[in-house]
Amino acid sequence: MRGCLQLARWLSAAPKGTAASLTRAPFGLANATRFFTNSAARAGSRATASKPVTDLENRISAIPIERYRNFCIVAHVDHGKSTLSDRLLELTGTIQPGSNKQVLDKLDVERERGITVKAQTCTMIYNHNGEDYLLHLVDTPGHVDFRAEVSRSYASCGGALLLVDASQGVQAQTVANFYLAFAQGLELIPVINKVDLPSAEPQRALDQMKHTFELDTENAVMVSAKTGLNVEQLLPTVVDKIPAPIGDCKKPLRMLLVDSWYDSYKGVICLVRIFDGELRAGQQVVSFATGLKYYVGEVGIMYPNETAQSVIRAGQVGYIYFNPGMKRSQEAKIGDTFTKVGSEKAVQPLPGFEEPKAMVFVAAYPVDADHFEHLEDSINQLVLNDRSITVQKESSEALGAGFRLGFLGTLHCSVFEDRLRQEHGASIIITPPSVPVKVIWTDGKEEIITSPVRFPDDEEVRNKIAEIQEPYVLATLTFPEEYLGKVIELCEANRGEQKTLEYFTATQVILKYELPLAQLVDDFFGKLKGSTKGYASLDYEESAWQPGHIVKLQLLVNKAPVDAVARIMHSSQVDRLARQWVTKFKQHVDRQLFEVVIQAAVGRKVIARETVKPYRKDVLAKLHASDVSRRRKLLEKQKEGRKRLRAVGNVVIEHKAFQAFLAK
């Protein structure tokens, strides 16, 4: 009774609101229960949708699509893309000038390494000749391993700033990224950066651009992104040279999913480009790829962080998330087209993106087997943000359950490993990178093998296999002419075949070599930098599959194979690696009561061997020095005992031994 009276007091003391005020939801409370699974979600949606229109939104809504400009910055690694992005954001008032450093490099690993890994986007408003322009900037990665990020970014853009370092000139990835942009039909604006450096040679860089790309460099802009010199000249050039996107707000919604990432509160957030129509919170959309339907919880722009808006229109790039969110991260398919429910027949889906192929594979295992599920969740969340990674579950007798991961290159793999450790606190064991091989059977069937576990044994190779092929790449190397001899020597030592050699200035060389991908992932870039004192740059593209003498090298401990360590490789690498393996593994295996034999073998042929000596009990301690027959008898007995122990004893190898052995 006392509880009922207390409840009545609370209810009577509650503020009284009119019933009418509850019906002012933007899309009608009668239908709200269809959109959201619970009352908390309904309340969240009303709060999102009923935000007052801001001054920023009023300015954006007044800009017609003819005054939109979508552009990106194309350059080699470390030529100043992210720094230039900062200056442009400051110039347009998007961020405050001063202490900003690589605002669009949002990952810890990007700030640590000083490279861009993920293409990041930002919307800016720029006033030119008294009129507002809506500029959409994409800061793209420069490294070859993130080519898929670059090509996806170009789908959102109408033009690009082709940025070249005044002191280094045109580099390998400048060439590669130029051809990607050129193939997409982007309008290119030449920009020379770092003109304030004492070693800067702007005219040489301009001549290289003119000779290599056949670009008109008369209107090239000379800037210093670090000091801000001449950066203000870039934006009028962007407005004048880059075309506006094509789109119609009155047509049915046609929206391309460009990227996605995971937020612990909002779930899957999607970066989208609107080609036609417009999108508001509360509307229902459908995916062409999966057929699944979603209610939009929030729409907005990156300014430079997520900034909610009431609507995003044709020509804009923005973010959305659904409420309720996507049930599985795999539902967000990059390159998918969305439209409003009911408009499916009126809308033609967009072509989407070419799926990048993983070319470098590693196995990943949790240090503690109990953390397998945590590792699986962490990998799935990162794959949501990077769809070029392939994931397959794998099991090892030595290391337990794990994953076989495929990457675009070794830097891609290294960055993913760093992100797993930093963003998710995952403790993992990673095996050395390997490349896929193609097995052609005698009956004509072809099979791509990415894991040593699936590689055929010796008998199958002899009797059932016609040929084994390995992937080759066409590598483009640029470097000063004085290192030509050393670079050719390095390429030849790595089974390379020279294709072209040309000088694009009196002192700079472009050398093209066809190289096995397996040699490229074996620290080829590090060796190249060492041979040229850091002056060389490298880019590569897929070439073809070529036949090779491919074998599987295994590590045996007391004749038992250690599956986690096996590698597929060319026979020319076997001797060197086999000796390295047995020497290194011996250092991490504890002594036992019996002899431990460590061998590296190809099939039945042992290539290298090391032995871990056993502990030895002094059985002669109590004997008199002259008792020779007794001495012999005790030693024979000890020898027999060891033989029996070796026959039945299993070598116990600690987890930390594998961790130390596989560590770089």
Swiss-Prot record:
Enzyme class name: hydrolase
Feature: transit peptide: 1-43
Main location (coarse class): mitochondrion
Name of this chain's protein: Translation factor guf1, mitochondrial
Catalytically driven reaction(s): GTP + H2O = GDP + phosphate + H(+)
InterPro entries membership: EF-4, EFG_III/V, EFG_V-like, G_TR_CS, LepA_C_sf, LepA_CTD, LepA_IV, P-loop_NTPase
Subcellular location: Mitochondrion inner membrane
Biological role: Promotes mitochondrial protein synthesis. May act as a fidelity factor of the translation reaction, by catalyzing a one-codon backward translocation of tRNAs on improperly translocated ribosomes. Binds to mitochondrial ribosomes in a GTP-dependent manner.
Keywords from the UniProt entry: GTP-binding, Hydrolase, Membrane, Mitochondrion, Mitochondrion inner membrane, Nucleotide-binding, Protein biosynthesis, Transit peptide
Gene behind the chain: guf1
One annotated Gene Ontology cellular component of this protein: mitochondrial inner membrane
UniProt keyword Zinc present: no
E.C. no: 3.6.5.-
